[in-house]
């Protein structure tokens, strides 16, 4: 297996313009495909997940052109539900941001479509979404294991009264919200259980509004969506930088700045993961906010004990930042780490122990006490982009770190290690 050894880094300094947000890119692509008119998307993320969405849209007859660097996409909308040219199978890799929204959107009208993906995708639960779509009339079959992809979709979704479980993934609610306006009937969506990753719902509502559709949101417990609507292209749309990707650079600034400035997100950003900067501030770093930048300057870091439900992806970065903080850090209410690209709670606990940390892994929390000195280890990445990027921070010590399968960062940030090296002064 390919590996990359990062030598100790003395200082991290400088600015980085972030690649586009994965969450925003794939939502914007789907809405542009469903909309009336042409949309020019700029700062689109070029990554595996986005390529899977683009390939699916192409197979569904959507016309688009990409710039040479794949960060601008001019897409001609379908002016309504997507139509398959006949029976179709779409392979979506391990892209949850493609699988969940497409599973809902392709239940409009009369298609026959199979959605499948990599082996890990077949372990990522989708039963709560399927249950909700069936309540709205959708015909869906599981082709292998009950509650998991691959799925066969045969249309039939008309709207109506729907319940959705919000406790596993906010993407199920996102998928229903984006699909419901195109259903023939009005839809009332009731959320049961605690809604995880609520800020991601704000991204969805924000984008729907940009494409001309507003819905009634009653305290994130009930959403009322008028049926028979259309999405309308905003013409041009700039995808903001990926706030989860920003977390690694901001953390590096907190640990070994200098000052690190990330551009493409800021106080006006719609992504909840910008709140990651507040956590670094609580730990002792200095944060400066602009409309389209966040800067982090080094401070003496101390441990925290926090509920991380609102920023589950960026919270992973705090787990490795904790290696540089004084005391024991506890991250709580993060059960949904277990249903991501890998079981991230298990993976994080396992790899933190390899570098010498004392770790307690609970059902929905992790407790981390750093060692006096970090140990050089080969870090397994579990085909999970965030594991690779999180553990790169270990090199901000006097110990090297070896990352196995470093190219797995292609899911959201193909040139991550090059960018980190550009801003680093070797020890």
From Swiss-Prot:
Pfam family, one: EPSP_synthase
Pathway: Metabolic intermediate biosynthesis; chorismate biosynthesis; chorismate from D-erythrose 4-phosphate and phosphoenolpyruvate: step 6/7
Family: Belongs to the EPSP synthase family.
Entry's localization field: Cytoplasm
GO biological process: amino acid biosynthetic process; aromatic amino acid family biosynthetic process; chorismate biosynthetic process
Enzyme class, broadest EC rank: transferase
Reactions listed under catalytic activity: 3-phosphoshikimate + phosphoenolpyruvate = 5-O-(1-carboxyvinyl)-3-phosphoshikimate + phosphate
Subunit and interaction comment: Monomer.
Residues that hold 3-phosphoshikimate according to the record: 22-23, 27, 169-171, 197, 313, 336, 340
Described purpose of this protein according to its UniProt entry: Catalyzes the transfer of the enolpyruvyl moiety of phosphoenolpyruvate (PEP) to the 5-hydroxyl of shikimate-3-phosphate (S3P) to produce enolpyruvyl shikimate-3-phosphate and inorganic phosphate.
Active site: 313 (proton acceptor)
InterPro entries xref list: Enolpyruvate_Tfrase_dom, Enolpyruvate_Tfrase_sf, EPSP_synthase, EPSP_synthase_CS, RNA3'P_cycl/enolpyr_Trfase_a/b
Taxonomic lineage from the root: Bacteria, Pseudomonadati, Pseudomonadota, Gammaproteobacteria, Enterobacterales
An example Gene Ontology CC term for this record: cytoplasm
EC nos: 2.5.1.19
Residues noted as binding phosphoenolpyruvate in the record, renumbered to the chain: 22, 96, 124, 171, 344, 386, 411
Cytoplasm listed as a keyword: yes
Protein name: 3-phosphoshikimate 1-carboxyvinyltransferase
Keyword field: Amino-acid biosynthesis, Aromatic amino acid biosynthesis, Cytoplasm, Transferase
Biological source species: Salmonella typhimurium (strain LT2 / SGSC1412 / ATCC 700720)
MF term (GO), any: 3-phosphoshikimate 1-carboxyvinyltransferase activity
């Amino acid at each position: 297996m390919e590996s990359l050894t990062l030598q100790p880094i003395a200082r991290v300094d400088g600015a980085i313009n972030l690649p586009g947000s994965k969450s925003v890119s794939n939502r914007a692509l789907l809405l542009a495909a469903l909309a009336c008119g042409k949309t020019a998307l700029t700062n689109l993320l070029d990554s595996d997940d986005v390529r899977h969405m683009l390939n699916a849209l192409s197979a569904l007859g959507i016309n688009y052109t990409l710039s040479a660097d794949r960060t601008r996409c001019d897409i001609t909308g379908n002016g309504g539900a997507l139509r398959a040219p006949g029976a179709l199978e779409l392979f979506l890799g391990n892209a949850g941001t493609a699988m969940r929204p497409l599973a809902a959107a392709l239940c409009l009208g009369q298609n026959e479509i199979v959605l499948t993906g990599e082996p890990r995708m077949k372990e990522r639960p989708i039963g709560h979404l399927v249950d909700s779509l069936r309540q709205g009339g959708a015909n869906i079959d599981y082709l292998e294991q009950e509650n998991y992809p691959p799925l066969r979709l045969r249309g039939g979704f008309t709207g109506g009264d729907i319940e959705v479980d919000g406790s596993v993934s906010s993407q199920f609610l996102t998928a229903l919200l984006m699909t419901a306006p195109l259903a023939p009937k009005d839809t009332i969506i009731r959320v049961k259980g605690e809604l995880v990753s609520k800020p991601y719902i704000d991204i969805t509502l924000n984008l729907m509004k940009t494409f001309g559709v507003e819905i009634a949101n009653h305290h994130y417990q009930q959403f009322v969506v008028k049926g028979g609507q259309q999405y309308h292209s905003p013409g041009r749309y700039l995808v903001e930088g990926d706030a989860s990707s920003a977390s690694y650079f901001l953390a590096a600034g907190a640990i070994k700045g200098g000052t690190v400035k990330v551009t493409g997100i800021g106080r006006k950003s719609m992504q909840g993961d910008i709140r990651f900067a507040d956590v670094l501030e609580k730990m002792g770093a200095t944060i400066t906010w602009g409309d389209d930048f966040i800067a982090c300057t080094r401070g003496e870091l101390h441990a925290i004990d926090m509920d991380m439900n609102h920023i589950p992806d960026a919270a992973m970065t705090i787990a490795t930042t904790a290696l540089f903080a004084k005391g024991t850090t506890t991250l709580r209410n993060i059960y949904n780490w277990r249903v991501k690209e890998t079981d991230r709670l298990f993976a994080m606990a396992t790899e933190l122990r390899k570098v010498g940390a004392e770790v307690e892994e609970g059902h929905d929390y992790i407790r981390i006490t750093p060692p006096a000195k970090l140990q050089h280890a080969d870090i397994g990445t579990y085909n999970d982009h965030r594991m690779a990027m999180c553990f790169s921070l270990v090199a901000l010590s006097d110990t090297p770190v070896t990352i196995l399968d470093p190219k797995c960062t292609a899911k959201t940030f193909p040139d991550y290690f090059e960018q980190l090296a550009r801003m680093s002064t070797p020890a």
